[in-house]
Amino acid sequence: MNLSHKTMFMTLYIVFLLIFGSYNATARIGPIKLSETEIVQTRSRQEIIGGFTFKGRVFHSFSKRVLVPPSGPSMRHNSVVNNLKH
């Protein structure tokens, strides 16, 4: 391998690491849930929400809104587990 191939592969490797690292960082933040009143107020003031909005959630990495809490076991799941005989 000559020097230009090594340089090209190192550049691609670094770019791959940067892209993969930034994807993991943004994926951990997760979607942001907006209430319908916030969406209506934002539209009425003609402000732009930064990011892609889908069913009341905004998908972007730098958020100023309330994060959606992670989902846990449901009450139905808890009742089934609690009723099991040990």
From Swiss-Prot:
GO CC, alphabetical: extracellular region
Keywords, comma-separated and alphabetical: Secreted, Signal
Primary localization class, coarse: secreted
Compartments reported by the entry: Secreted, Extracellular space
Record-level GO BP terms: floral organ abscission
Endpoints of the signal sequence: 1-27
Top-rank taxon: Eukaryota
Tissues expressing this chain: Expressed in roots.
Additional information: IDL1 is redundant with IDA.
Domain characteristics, as noted in the entry: The N-terminal signal peptide is necessary for IDL1 function.
The protein's role, per its UniProt record: Involved in an ethylene-independent separation step of floral abscission. May act with RLK5 and HSL2 as ligand-receptor pairs.
Entry protein name: Protein IDA-LIKE 1
